[in-house]
Design a protein with these regions (language model features):
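Extracytoplasmic cell-surface/polysaccharide-interacting catalytic and binding patches
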Residues: 2-269
Length: 269
């Protein structure tokens, strides 16, 4: 009888020791699997991290070192509806050699010629669809578009004609608001198009220009994705601003308004 009792006591002690060992070992271990992932996977408990509810979204990186330029130089002049050119403004221009009558800034002409030569060397045909336009020429273009929209109304004082003028503003720049008057802008195509639909144009042609234009001091002035900032969607329009500024603008995916505002804080766009 005493032997049975002793054996029973030893069993209890042994069982207690085993249970104690298990509990202690569990206390020292981290949970193996506790969280299910959205893709059906699971992760270890010690690898789980939770978002800080007070954290703020990391802003898009902005350029640190901006070009040291004099924004008052003619090549940086801002031209839009709020920053107009006078009717008397006439830059020094000359004919672009590969065209019949298109004119461009004399000072920037070597850069344009070099870019168009390189474009042709890359295997593309170049068609200059627009370059320098005087104030009076832009005025004729605008009035022609307004009259076309208003037809058959011809009375300038008629409300319907005024509505046509407002519609024309969405299609054609008003005189004094076009960069073409600066003599620093060109509309470039690989051929003459009957309608300007960018998606139907040669995208390899523009891919080359977008990659290399800054090497010659030009920027893509009115890219589609910057429409809300520039007010215009003309991805075939290239503007000369000089190599330093052009490389910075194109490399940082800026439109000219964003670049200009850095140097002229009061400028709003």
């Amino acid at each position: 009888m005493r032997r049975k009792r002793t054996a029973w006591i030893l069993c209890v002690v042994a069982l207690t020791t085993v249970l104690y060992t298990i509990v202690v070992s569990r206390m020292d271990r981290k949970t193996d699997i506790i969280v299910g992932g959205v893709d059906g996977a699971f992760v270890r408990g010690d690898s789980v991290s939770f978002a800080d509810p007070n954290a703020t979204e990391t802003p898009e990186p902005t350029p640190d070192i901006w070009p040291d330029i004099d924004i008052t130089l003619p090549q940086y002049q801002m031209v839009n509806e709020e920053h107009n050119l006078a009717a008397a403004f006439e830059p020094e221009v000359a004919k672009i050699e590969r065209t019949s009558y298109m004119m461009f800034s004399v000072a920037a002409m070597p850069h344009l010629d070099a870019m168009l030569d390189a474009l042709e060397d890359a295997g593309f045909t170049v068609h200059v669809g627009g370059a320098y336009r005087s104030y009076s020429f832009q005025n004729k273009m605008f009035n022609s578009k307004a009259s076309q929209i208003a037809y058959p109304v011809t009375d300038y004082t008629d409300p319907k004609y005024q509505e046509a003028v407002e519609e024309a503003k969405k299609i054609t720049m008003m005189p004094g608001t076009s960069e073409h008057q600066l003599g620093l802008a060109v509309d470039l195509f690989d051929k003459q198009y009957t309608r300007l639909v960018y998606s139907e144009m040669n995208q390899d042609f523009y891919a080359w220009l977008d990659e290399h234009c800054a090497e010659y001091g030009f920027i893509k002035r009115y890219p589609t994705k910057k429409l809300l900032l520039t007010g215009w969607d003309e991805p075939w329009h290239y503007r000369y601003v000089g190599v330093e500024a052009a490389k910075f603008i194109m490399e940082n995916d800026l439109c000219y308004e964003e670049f200009y505002a850095h140097y002229v804080p009061e400028f709003k766009y």
